[in-house]
Amino acid sequence: MPSLPGVNHQDAVRALEKAGFRVARQGKHVVMTDGSRVVTIPRHNPVNAITMGNIVRDAGLTNEEFRELL
């Protein structure tokens, strides 16, 4: 699985919003949902590449699809 290094958490939130996710709540992490899936994004920059890969997988996207949304 190719990694997604250096992704800013705000860019990740915007990309997931384009994919149909909405912010459910915020704190030290941003919790987003599309109605059936829930993903949690840490609010620190940059988000670790392995963590970002897991978030993308949990959102039901491929790394390539996510990169197109960035």
Predicted region positions:
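Basic nucleic-acid-binding interfaces
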Residues: 1-70
